[in-house]
Amino acid sequence: MRLYDLSFYEIEKFFYKLAELKDIISDTGLLSISPSIPQTLPAQGTVMAKHAFPIFQKGGVIMDVTNVTQAEIAENAGAVAVMVLDKLPYDVRKSGGVARMADPKIIEEVMNSITIPVMAKVRIGHYYEARVLEALGVDMIDESEVLTPADEEHHINKWEFKVPFVNGARNLGEALRRIYEGASMIRTKGEAGTGNVSEAVKHMKIMNYEISTLISLPEEDRLKKAREYQVPYQLVELVVKLKRLPIVNFAAGGIATPADAALMMWLGSDGIFVGSGIFKSQDPDQRAKAVVLAAANWEDPEIVLEAQKMISENKSMMGIDIKTLKPEELLQVRGV
């Protein structure tokens, strides 16, 4: 039996227990216990620890940063975590060449300067960039299509690591394959570095539609879907039981305004990644606070309105129309 299969049985058991607990709470009318006050912390690197960490980020905003100053702005604005890169996605597009993991010295400086979790990106399939970040002590690794893939065919086997991973996905099949590989969090790919939320919207809607379709299928057709997605049938059944992905699903790719963040939360996102939208704008301090406010209060249009008033549209990053991008310029097609 492969390591993937052995590890998957652990996660399957864990999430079925969560599903059963959810049913019990619903049936009895009991209030759920706040996850922010765990009675016993799970051991580092266990399935429970790796999948519990992203749950604590739910409802929050994670911001891309390239230096300590930006990280401090993000923390002061109320971000739940930061993602350290060498360049913001917009600059990755403009500079061309090979985009790699950020300088470990910069990541370490950020870790020593703020109190919120610090994440960092690695290239798809780059096992040793991930090992370096794990040794550095980051809180989560993003195996990201924004960076130049090291392996065009395979992703990292994330079960071998103690640190949790996040991966991008455009649809249910991509999401389930990444979960089967050991991802602890999924995010929409969107089209990073564009300031254009349309692709993130499309990917979230595709995910929602494919989940609802899967739920309505008879068992025989769900078996076919498992083969199509190249994942165990038990993982497909877990999605059906939970009526959602079994792990946290954030929105990312082109989010630039408070209204963008609220829109993605309304579509069912568990939280928000903001890349170039904050620090390629001319009002990063206010915009960071406004996006956090809108994401946390997306159900209240009046508060989202106040958040939108905190920024100026003429200070927003210059967006890119997706239709003007050549096929080879699309980042979302990397890593399927």
From Swiss-Prot:
Reactions accelerated catalytically: aldehydo-D-ribose 5-phosphate + D-glyceraldehyde 3-phosphate + L-glutamine = pyridoxal 5'-phosphate + L-glutamate + phosphate + 3 H2O + H(+)
UniProt cross-references to PANTHER family, sorted A to Z: PYRIDOXAL 5'-PHOSPHATE SYNTHASE SUBUNIT SNZ1-RELATED (PTHR31829:SF0)
UniProt record similarity statement: Belongs to the PdxS/SNZ family.
Function comment: Catalyzes the formation of pyridoxal 5'-phosphate from ribose 5-phosphate (RBP), glyceraldehyde 3-phosphate (G3P) and ammonia. The ammonia is provided by the PdxT subunit. Can also use ribulose 5-phosphate and dihydroxyacetone phosphate as substrates, resulting from enzyme-catalyzed isomerization of RBP and G3P, respectively.
Membrane-spanning parts: none
Quaternary structure note: In the presence of PdxT, forms a dodecamer of heterodimers.
Protein's name according to its UniProt entry: Pyridoxal 5'-phosphate synthase subunit PdxS
Alphabetized GO MF terms: pyridoxal 5'-phosphate synthase (glutamine hydrolysing) activity
Record EC number: 4.3.3.6
Gene name of the record: pdxS
Pfam families: SOR_SNZ
Catalytic residues as annotated in Swiss-Prot or TrEMBL: 121
UniProt pathway annotation: Cofactor biosynthesis; pyridoxal 5'-phosphate biosynthesis
GO biological process: amino acid metabolic process; pyridoxal phosphate biosynthetic process; pyridoxine biosynthetic process
